[in-house]
Amino acid sequence: RLVLEVXASVEADV
């Protein structure tokens, strides 16, 4: 879940 959250954060940043 932490990894998914980080990935989502990066995608949202883009």
Curated annotation (Swiss-Prot):
Annotated compartments: Secreted
Molecular function terms, GO-annotated: toxin activity
Organism superkingdom: Eukaryota
Keyword check for Protease: no
Tissue expression as described in the entry: Expressed by the venom gland.
Signal peptide (from-to): none
Keyword entries, A-Z: Bradykinin receptor impairing toxin, G-protein coupled receptor impairing toxin, Secreted, Toxin, Vasoactive, Vasodilator
Presence of keyword Secreted: yes
GO biological process: vasodilation
A single cellular component GO annotation: extracellular region
Protein family: Belongs to the bradykinin-related peptide family.
Further remarks about this protein from its record: The molecular weight of about 4 kDa suggests that the mature peptide comprises about 36 amino acid residues.
Function: Has kinin-like biological properties. Causes contraction of isolated guinea pig ileum and relaxation of rat duodenum. Has a number of hypotensive properties: decreases arterial blood pressure and increases capillary permeability. Induces edema when injected into hindpaw of rat. May target bradykinin receptors (BDKRB). Does not lyse unfibrinolysed blood.
Protein's name in the database: Kinin-like peptide-S
